Amino acid sequence: MAEQQKGLTYADAGVDIDAGNALVERIKPAAKRTARPGTVSGLGGFGALFDLKAAGYHDPVLVAATDGVGTKLRIAIDTGEVDTIGIDLVAMCVNDLVCQGAEPLFFLDYFATGKLEVAQAARIIEGIAEGCAASGCALIGGETAEMPGMYHKGDFDLAGFAVGAMERGADLPQGVAEGDVLLGLGSNGVHSNGYSFVRKVVELSGLGWDAPAPFGGDSLGRALLAPTRLYVKQALAAVRAGGVHALAHITGGGLTENLPRVLPEGLGARIDLSAWELPPVFRWLAETASMAEPELLKTFNCGIGMIVVVAADRADEIAALLAAEGETVTRIGEVIAGEGVSYDGRLL
C-alpha cells in the first residue's frame, strides 16, 4: 500500500502554536510581578478577572482607555531597540485614565506580527509589564496574533487597553474656574506622538538611527525612543491631596489642542512660553524642518507632558507635593475667560 500522503498543518500555513505557547510561559513571571490588590487570575484563561471590592472600592465608576504608540514603532523595529516600546504603550493609556481622576487597575495588550519571534515578543511584553508595575496596574491578559501575509518580515503592531476606577463623584475635570493655575510637569522628549513628522525630519537631515543625536545624548535612534513618562502615581497623589480641578495629558495636538479638552465652555487658558526652556530635541526638529512655533505647539508636547489645573490658593502646596514625588514642576499659566489657548512669550 502506498504511504499515506501527509496533510498540511497550521505550521505549514505560517502559524506556530508552539511558539505562542512558549511566549505565554516566558512572560508569565513578568505579568505576575504586576499583580496588585484585586488581581484574581493569571494569564492563559479565556478571560481575566478583577475584584473591585478587593481593590478597595465601594461605589466605583469604571474608566477605560485604549491607544497605541503610532509610528514610533517604526524606529523601534528599524533599530531593533524594542525593550521600552511597551512602556510607551502603557503610558499612553494610563496617563489618559488619570486625567479622568481614575486609578489604573488592569491592562491588556494586543501584539500582532507576521511571524512570531518569541525572543522579540518577550522583550516587548516585558516592557509592557515594567510600565504596568510602575503605574500600579496589573497586566492580566492580552492577545498575540500571528498573521502570515499581513506584515512585512520583522514588523509588528501594538495596542493597549487599560481600565481604571474612581469612587462615584470623584471624576475629573471638576470645578475648573477662572484664575486656576496651570502647573506643567516636564516631559523627557517626544513621548509617543508626532513620529511621522519626526521620521520625515530625520529623512531630511540625512542622518541614520545610529548617528550621534544632534541634540545631545545617545544615538539618534535611542534618543528618540526614550519612553513616554508615566505620571500616574504623582498625579493621583496630587488629586488625593485636594484642589486639583483637571489634568491634561499633552499628546497629539500638543498644548494647543489638548488643554481645551478639560476646560468648560467659556473658559480658556493663557500660557507663558518663557516659563520653561524648550528641550533641545524640539528645537532641533523645528530648526531642521523650518517649523513655525504655532505648528510646533499643536504637534508636540514641547517639554510639558502633563498639565495640572489647580485652585490658585492650593497651587504652591500641590507644586511642592509634585516636586517631592520627583516631578519637574513649572507654573506655566492660568485659566482665563474666553476660549482656546493663548500664548505669551516665545519658545523659539
UniProtKB/Swiss-Prot annotation:
Gene Ontology process terms (BP): 'de novo' IMP biosynthetic process; adenine biosynthetic process
Pathway: Purine metabolism; IMP biosynthesis via de novo pathway; 5-amino-1-(5-phospho-D-ribosyl)imidazole from N(2)-formyl-N(1)-(5-phospho-D-ribosyl)glycinamide: step 2/2
One GO CC annotation: cytosol
Keywords associated with the record: ATP-binding, Cytoplasm, Ligase, Nucleotide-binding, Purine biosynthesis
Database matches in Pfam families: AIRS, AIRS_C
Record's keyword annotation contains Ligase: yes
UniProt superkingdom: Bacteria
Positions of transmembrane segments: none
Compartmental location: Cytoplasm
Enzyme Commission number(s) of this protein: 6.3.3.1
This protein's record includes keyword Thylakoid: no
Enzyme class: ligase
GO molecular function, one term: phosphoribosylamine-glycine ligase activity
Catalytic activity: 2-formamido-N(1)-(5-O-phospho-beta-D-ribosyl)acetamidine + ATP = 5-amino-1-(5-phospho-beta-D-ribosyl)imidazole + ADP + phosphate + H(+)
Chief location: cytoplasm
HAMAP family attached to this UniProt entry: AIRS
Family named by the database record: Belongs to the AIR synthase family.
Protein name: Phosphoribosylformylglycinamidine cyclo-ligase
Originating organism: Cereibacter sphaeroides (strain ATCC 17029 / ATH 2.4.9) (Rhodobacter sphaeroides)
